[in-house]
């Protein structure tokens, strides 16, 4: 399954930020690369990161699914997600520590779904992408 880590596209991110408002860089990447049915995972401890929220809004407009990982309140990202996993903490470092087992659980669930013993004959239809922020 193809996956793209938006923050790791350093040359695009820095070039965009040189000429445009950097809070739109992830939204622009989702607009250009995302397809209906793809999944965007938006991670923001407060849920209020403008760059993540704008990417989520664009993803929804394109028919993508949006999963948010936030702290207790969910912030603005809560309303821009199909599913928002909220770590039950308010302090940044505690939220980030609680996000670690969530990432690993999501990865294990994907591996089991796509590559588990009962799914060895799984065939992929339309190309789908998993987006990480």
Residue ranges and their predicted role:
Residues 114-133:
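Internal, active-site/partner-interface "lid" segment
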Residues 1-120:
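Glycine-rich phosphate-binding loops that contact phosphosugars or nucleotide phosphates
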């Amino acid at each position: 399954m193809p996956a793209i880590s938006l923050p790791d596209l350093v040359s695009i991110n820095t070039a965009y930020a040189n000429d445009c408002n950097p809070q739109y860089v992830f939204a622009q990447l989702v607009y250009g690369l995302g397809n209906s049915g793809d999944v965007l995972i938006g991670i923001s401890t407060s849920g209020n990161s403008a760059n993540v929220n704008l990417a989520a809004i664009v993803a929804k407009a394109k028919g993508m699914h949006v999963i948010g990982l936030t702290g207790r309140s969910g912030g603005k990202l809560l309303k821009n997600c199909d599913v928002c996993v909220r770590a039950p903490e308010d302090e940044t470092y505690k939220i980030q520590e609680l996000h670690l087992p969530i990432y690993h659980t999501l990865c294990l669930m994907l591996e089991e779904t796509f590559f588990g013993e009962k799914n060895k004959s799984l065939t992929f239809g339309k190309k789908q992408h998993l987006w990480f922020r």
